[in-house]
Amino acid sequence: MSRRKQAKPRSVKVEEGEASDFSLAWDSSVAAAGGLEGESECDRKSSRALEDRNSVTSQEERNEDDEDVEDESIYTCDHCQQDFESLADLTDHRAHRCPGDGDDDPQLSWVASSPSSKDVASPTQMIGDGCDLGLGEEEGGTGLPYPCQFCDKSFIRLSYLKRHEQIHSDKLPFKCTFCSRLFKHKRSRDRHIKLHTGDKKYHCHECEAAFSRRDHLKIHLKTHSSSKPFKCSVCKRGFSSTSSLQSHMQAHKKNKEHLAKSEKEAKKDDFMCDYCEDTFSQTEELEKHVLTLHPQLSEKADLQCIHCPEVFVDESTLLAHIHQAHANQKHKCPMCPEQFSSVEGVYCHLDSHRQPDSSNHSVSPDPVLGSVASMSSATPDSTPDPVLGSVASMSSATPDSSASVERGSTPDSTLKPLRGQKKMRDDGQSWSKVVYSCPYCSKRDFTSLAVLEIHLKTIHADKPQQSHTCQICLDSMPTLYNLNEHVRKLHKSHAYPVMQFGNISAFHCNYCPEMFADINSLQEHIRVSHCGPNANPPDGNNAFFCNQCSMGFLTESSLTEHIQQAHCSVGSTKLESPVIQPTQSFMEVYSCPYCTNSPIFGSILKLTKHIKENHKNIPLAHSKKSKAEQSPVSSDVEVSSPKRQRLSGSANSISNGEYPCNQCDLKFSNFESFQTHLKLHLELLLRKQACPQCKEDFDSQESLLQHLTVHYMTTSTHYVCESCDKQFSSVDDLQKHLLDMHTFVLYHCTLCQEVFDSKVSIQVHLAVKHSNEKKMYRCTACNWDFRKEADLQVHVKHSHLGNPAKAHKCIFCGETFSTEVELQCHITTHSKKYNCRFCSKAFHAVLLLEKHLREKHCVFDPAAENGTANGVPPTSTKKAEPADLQGMLLKNPEAPNSHEASEDDVDASEPMYGCDICGAAYTMEVLLQNHRLRDHNIRPGEDDGSRKKAEFIKGSHKCNVCSRTFFSENGLREHLQTHRGPAKHYMCPICGERFPSLLTLTEHKVTHSKSLDTGTCRICKMPLQSEEEFIEHCQMHPDLRNSLTGFRCVVCMQTVTSTLELKIHGTFHMQKLAGSSAASSPNGQGLQKLYKCALCLKEFRSKQDLVRLDVNGLPYGLCAGCMARSANGQVGGLAPPEPADRPCAGLRCPECNVKFESAEDLESHMQVDHRDLTPETSGPRKGAQTSPVPRKKTYQCIKCQMTFENEREIQIHVANHMIEEGINHECKLCNQMFDSPAKLLCHLIEHSFEGMGGTFKCPVCFTVFVQANKLQQHIFAVHGQEDKIYDCSQCPQKFFFQTELQNHTMSQHAQ
């Protein structure tokens, strides 16, 4: 998941002097405003509307900040032209500090407070006005901080520059089709257009505003919060943001600086006022001064004037201030045309228009008085409209006060009006004194609502404020001032006829003859007078009232459901329908036909508003239709709700004493007949109730409701996010939302287990924490690399210190030379004079030829040395011819020994393919073809004779030693390794001598043994007769200090590093023991010597069991069986049975090359599996005379070294490895990762030859390569499992290199 980096708005450049002067002047003006700066509801609303209207364009400039300098965000107030760094500061300034009008100019296309507008007017206005801003500083000049990029003008503010740039329409060719704004680049215009059409996924839960960015939503949410958690520690003033508080603290900081300065000038005055800088000698005088002149800075002052920001300590001082400072202001009564000079006089006069509450514990005083009190506290300087008193009295807001009525000595007495008492009193008459109490604290001695409102606004300003609802259109207003303006502009013509006092417009109580001017007064009267426990309403009515809210219902079940839902109560008293006293004609009230509790509304407009908001604009049920088509529910309401009917303007029927029926136009002379007639209408309509959708009739309202629910019920499945509670219509949308919003990509360091949230962070971490430097020390004479300086010193001591003038030594004759070129020229004098009689290999020295004969051809007779290098051996006197015998030896697959400790790069048992140009030999024809193509540029199939000399001469890479030429640099590099000889990297820890391989070092270390001629175990003193007993004793006496193998030689007590080294010790000690025993015994008795057949490698106790043959001057011994098969023309047939006292070993099937332990098993195998073969045809397949029988091809897993017979099995096995272990393979030596075991093996080979000058030597045949992958390919092609040197002590696996063993131990056998 990626998220684009959001732009940060750039701060506006302001001069230091200008900023300090503005801060001081601004904080002084704000300090004078006192605590009223957070209570202006008008400003809050304007800020909220400002934010909502510009939520789209406020995002654009922050995104454009990444590309264009002209699109950097700036926030400027459109009234006072002050710039701000963030939208939060601008919103706080507009809501609480801006001295200008809070209303936005509707003619501007972008509001000035939006960051997208940049205080820029509409482009059409700018072009029409000619950029005449009307101010001198906005016209621009020269040398100002913000120059125009299109002309020579510069401006003092960035906002002026943005306005000016819009006139350069030729330089801004891209125009927004939505708001006509101009842009310099198309990408800016396209990104801006997306803000008009893009999705806003961040919605405000308080209002319907939506934003495209989360930070814009956070800024917008601050406009809904009235809390100011940041308090000034000096003046206790609250702020909504830290930036506003810091700006305010600058004023106190300057006051402290002036205080320090004044203290130095006048040391006698110790106390100074923080507001006016007056000094006093005592704290009492300072406190008195603050209480008198600056009460807003005093902690004791908690009462604020409703007309101005002045704060006072007690009520008497506040009232005195109101009479003195605001005595000339006239206040009009909202109920009548009278005016008063003081607010208190208005409140006292309003008592004449209300009936006082019956209990001081009521939390709902008279709606008229409570609403007017709330109005006057919100807008004290505004003259209330006469309509406001009536409209506000119908609002649903509950005043924040409780009224306590005092009458005589019993303040809690219930005031019950007499039946014949007049409701409208004169102005001179007044009720008993009303005492008001605070609903939030224990104060109960407020003489008027004005004092109570002042107390609530100052002491309990953090309490939630009530909303005010218009009773005509049901719109909610934040303050009564807004409600007054709303009614005056929109509903003034509708409000007067309804709310005006007169003889023909009043509300009649159905329980008593009382009449009221508004429906709220009627509800209050019913709740007080007729809802008590002792009230006994008349019986026999079919309508019911709620005793808590005085709402009427048609059925008892509707009333019960209303009480449970609205008042969370089940035990409330139900009020039955009162008796109607018709003295005048009535007007109908309206009920919602779709609500279960059937609420009643006073006008069709209110009912329409209710249905539009709650029932999706369903048409009204009681429209002008015939009586048969009307809804039963609405008809029921119209008939059975005379309890809430209004009086009509005509009084003719009432004056005649008649009671007209509003359903059938009948008239009755007495009320009893009229009531009985209405019950007939009610019973007739309640018999059957029809569905308003399908006209189906139902017997009960419950069945009708259950049926009607089906028409409006739809089911849908939504998928909700558990984190943010957002709903989605499909699972795909939910998953996309979870991936986009609730998914994080983390980066895990496998070296130290730390987690990072970005790729850049982990790259920095790896570069700082895990990048270790490693120094290498190189010898300038031989270019060898060493990790430690001590190793280089030892190398110099043994290699270059003895003869510093001649540091290069010949490995054949020991002669030294001063330069490498002289050594290479000298090496050319050593030609390969000594040839092998069996495989045509040539060697530089006789010792190398003898070693080759012992290891490859099992020839240990020193008589072979007697023959010359190029001499012809004597012919054999036996039956078998030398040529046939040599062919038999070459064809036998078991004739050669293992490849261990071989110096040659080609196995003699494999076919040889020689290059007739340079003499290079290869085991495969493909390798020879690659060699000819790479080094001699001869393609397969071309005539070698015609191209041989020409292509040989064309080689551009020439060897400086032997003058041979090559076509590639790699071929020349590989050829040069043959002149340099094997590199000696293995040093003897006893004498310091170096050897080219670990095998030669092991053979050398044996010569340092002090127990050369002893064949006994030095631990248990038991004699050792064979190599098997030696190995068994070494396993019986393990070396716990040896962490590699766990073994040591029990004869010489040397520590061995591999199983191969242990076998070499056993062979060496047993051969010395056999030689010493034979020399010490006069009769030649002692350890019995075994003799092997040169063809089948069978062992015999007596030399007489073998027939001696001389082939090319070398003696060989063949058993009788091999001689018989040779005479019959067979090769490799069944061998004769071995002597009974010793089991035979090394029996193989000539057809499938399977090895058996005994001759009986081999014979049984031949009869079962190769029955069709006759003895004459049971020999091996005929082939070339120089090629033996090919071995069966097998496949070995590099990972676990398991062998498989076909390619499919190895593929399935490798696939299982990948499923179980994955495709990543780690090198435990350096923690690098590879995607295949072959690459890991190649990497481990590089570890083995670190610091070796870039050469790689085969540990088996010592062939030198310049690339590790070439050596790896060579090992796979030439050497097998039996040639591996290092054995794992904990499992049967073997390895060619020690680094392979170390990596295997750390990965598979780590504790």
Swiss-Prot record:
Entry-annotated residues carrying Phosphoserine: S55, S58, S631, S1081
GO biological process: brown fat cell differentiation; cerebellar granule cell precursor proliferation; cilium assembly; negative regulation of cold-induced thermogenesis; negative regulation of DNA-templated transcription; Notch signaling pathway; positive regulation of BMP signaling pathway; positive regulation of DNA-templated transcription
Keyword Phosphoprotein: yes
InterPro entries (UniProt xref): Znf_C2H2_sf, Znf_C2H2_type
Superkingdom of the source species: Eukaryota
One MF term in the entry's GO annotations: identical protein binding
Record's GO cellular component terms: nucleus
Basic residues composition-biased segments: 1-11
Subcellular location: Nucleus
Annotated TM spans: none
C2H2-type Zn finger ranges: 75-101, 146-168, 174-196, 202-224, 230-252, 271-294, 303-326, 331-353, 436-460, 468-491, 507-530, 544-567, 590-615, 659-681, 689-711, 719-742, 747-770, 777-800, 808-830, 834-857, 913-935, 957-979, 986-1008, 1047-1069, 1091-1109, 1147-1170, 1195-1217, 1225-1247, 1256-1279, 1286-1309
Residue spans of biased composition, Low complexity class: 390-404, 631-642
Stated role: Transcription factor that can both act as an activator or a repressor depending on the context. Plays a central role in BMP signaling and olfactory neurogenesis. Associates with SMADs in response to BMP2 leading to activate transcription of BMP target genes. Acts as a transcriptional repressor via its interaction with EBF1, a transcription factor involved in terminal olfactory receptor neurons differentiation; this interaction preventing EBF1 to bind DNA and activate olfactory-specific genes.
UniProt free text on domains: Uses different DNA- and protein-binding zinc fingers to regulate the distinct BMP-Smad and Olf signaling pathways. C2H2-type zinc fingers 14-19 mediate the interaction with SMAD1 and SMAD4, while zinc fingers 28-30 mediate the interaction with EBF1. zinc fingers 2-8 bind the 5'-CCGCCC-3' DNA sequence in concert with EBF1, while zinc fingers 9-13 bind BMP target gene promoters in concert with SMADs.
Family statement: Belongs to the krueppel C2H2-type zinc-finger protein family.
Binding partners and assembly: Homodimer. Interacts with PARP1, SMAD1 and SMAD4. Interacts with EBF1. Interacts with CEP290.
Name of protein: Zinc finger protein 423
